[in-house]
């Protein structure tokens, strides 16, 4: 899980979602998991 100030989609399978006010990227590739904070 990467914690970044700006989260971006890395590949086409990345999905931007909001969980409890936090922007997250979920993907089939675990390396692409990101969280804003």
Curated annotation (Swiss-Prot):
Instruction: Report the superkingdom from the record.
Output: Eukaryota
Instruction: Write out the annotated subcellular location.
Output: Plastid, Chloroplast
Under the heading PROSITE patterns, the entry gives: RIBOSOMAL_L36
UniProt keyword list: Chloroplast, Plastid, Ribonucleoprotein, Ribosomal protein
Which Gene Ontology cellular-component terms appear in the entry? chloroplast; ribonucleoprotein complex; ribosome
| Molecular-function GO term, any one | structural constituent of ribosome
Which GO annotations describe the biological process of this protein?
translation
Q: Which family does it belong to?
A: Belongs to the bacterial ribosomal protein bL36 family.
PANTHER family cross-referenced by the UniProt entry: 50S RIBOSOMAL PROTEIN L36, CHLOROPLASTIC, LARGE RIBOSOMAL SUBUNIT PROTEIN BL36C
What's the protein called, per UniProt?
Large ribosomal subunit protein bL36c
What species was this sequence derived from?
Tetradesmus obliquus (Green alga)
Which gene name belongs to this protein? rpl36
